[in-house]
């Protein structure tokens, strides 16, 4: 079974993907972690790397190609990626978009990254603007168009476990458990 989870920063992508990975006993891969890792190796923050990626398509292309190879080569995988749902929906059994209002996401990011909510809002706005411009320019993808997703969930008032349970219910209803290759 191949599952793609997309959504804006702070929507709960990583938390939900990790829970699903554990409950389904399948591999989890995060484009966000690869991107953060690259920023760390370059000794810059993620906002700065996003800015660099606006002028250098090779940065996004490298990460997206790695994700493409993974989803093609794995029978069972959960891919967590901002743009994965648009790029790889035809290769997945289930594509999911998680969303939440800016203030909710800012609280989550502030808590995770130990920054103020105001700083989190600034970072989120910068990252989202960068993502939207890059993905439109490089791929012709409007990240406001959610029509490619099988499932869209507002995570505002849900715990990650609740979101995972909703997704597991959809998997069960779609009979995707039989798609698991062991």
From Swiss-Prot:
It is found in: Cytoplasm. It catalyses: CMP + ATP = CDP + ADP; dCMP + ATP = dCDP + ADP. The keyword Glycoprotein does not apply. InterPro entries: Cyt_kin_arch, Cytidylate_kinase_dom, P-loop_NTPase. GO terms for molecular function: ATP binding; CMP kinase activity; dCMP kinase activity. Keywords: ATP-binding, Cytoplasm, Kinase, Nucleotide-binding, Transferase. ATP binds at residues 7-15. Its main location: cytoplasm. It comes from the Archaea. GO terms for cellular component: cytoplasm. Its EC number is 2.7.4.25. Pfam families: Cytidylate_kin2. GO terms for biological process: pyrimidine nucleotide metabolic process. Belongs to the cytidylate kinase family. Type 2 subfamily. This is Cytidylate kinase. The gene is cmk.
């Amino acid at each position: 079974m191949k599952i793609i989870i997309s959504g804006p920063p702070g929507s709960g992508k990583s938390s939900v993907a990790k829970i699903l990975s554990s409950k389904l006993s399948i591999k989890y891969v995060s484009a966000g972690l690869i991107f953060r890792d690259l920023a760390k190796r370059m000794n810059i923050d993620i906002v700065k790397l996003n800015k660099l990626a606006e002028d250098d398509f090779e940065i996004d292309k490298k990460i997206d190609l790695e994700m493409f190879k993974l989803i093609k080569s794995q029978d069972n995988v959960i891919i967590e990626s901002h743009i994965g749902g648009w790029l790889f929906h035809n290769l997945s059994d289930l594509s999911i978009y998680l969303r939440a209002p800016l203030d909710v996401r800012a609280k989550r990011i502030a808590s995770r990254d130990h920054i103020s909510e105001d700083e989190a809002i600034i970072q989120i706005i910068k990252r989202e603007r960068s993502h939207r411009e890059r993905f439109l320019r490089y791929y012709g993808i409007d990240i406001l168009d959610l029509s490619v997703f099988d499932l869209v969930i507002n995570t505002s008032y849900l715990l990650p476990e609740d979101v995972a349970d909703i997704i597991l219910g959809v998997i069960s209803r779609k009979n995707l458990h039989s798609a698991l290759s062991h």
